[in-house]
Amino acid sequence: MTDKLTVSVLGTGIMGAAMARNLARAGHTVHAWNRTRAKAEPLAAEGVRIADTPAQAVQDADVVLTILYDGPAALDTMREAVPALRPGTAWVQSTTAGIEGVAELAAFAREHGLLFYDAPVLGTRQPAEAGKLTVLAAGPAEGREKVTPVFDAVGARTVWSGEDGAQGGATRLKLVANSWVLAVTAAAGEALALSKALGVDPRGFFDLVAGGPLDMGYLRAKSELVLEDRLTPPQFAVNTAAKDARLIVQAGADHGVRLDVAEAAAARMERAAAQGHADEDMVAAYFASFDEKTDS
């Protein structure tokens, strides 16, 4: 079969829009839908065909890619799309939906004869736009020739973790990775907040740890967003990070593990969102260290 596919992208937020662009640039026929159509319309300039409904978007699709806010949003969208889907269509489910959410989505796919791939991605706006995401994937071997060109267009690397997407092996790995990302993001914010409170130049702290085991590029990159007031457009937004943090906490609780750091990170993200930072980069959780909205 040709490696040029008809791909439907349902959800054109930060990640979905970038993925749709890269699929089109790779030569695939791309249809896109977003609940707020205006967010999808700029993709038309890249050759993406904008649909009015999920069902319209998935007509004649070889692969459907969902990348929406959460599991319920993905399920609701696929319920709208499924009347137009052919049995055997590959469904690449990249929404971070949590373990229970993935199981529910996989059951829906099974009911309607779809090939289900649990395929969350690692990366934020910049790697998404560059087509350099890491795709974490689990799903049946017999359909991988359909989804591999999609993964190659949006990512630099695909990590397979089994043949049963319903088990959520890829999502489980994503939750572990995100737990680390959230922990270091929260820690960076608190270090900056303490520096401000104590009158310490944070760049002096960066110099202190430079070249040692505590140094990391992520700390510097995220901190600069705060120090230079470059929190928009977000690489990954506070409100989405808060949602993912709660999925991590729930996954731990469901498996008998108490995740105090993830719980604290979730609370910080939620507090920052309530202060007005919901649509800023997740490092804006820095502001949760202060009782009132403050300048960085």
What does each model-identified segment do?
Residues 1-66, 89, 125, 159:
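NAD(P)+-binding Rossmann beta1-loop-alpha1 motif at the extreme N-terminus of oxidoreductases
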Residues 54-114:
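Rossmann-fold NAD(P) dinucleotide-binding segment
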Residues 130-131, 135-137, 159, 163-198, ...:
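Active-site-proximal catalytic alpha-helix in oxidoreductases
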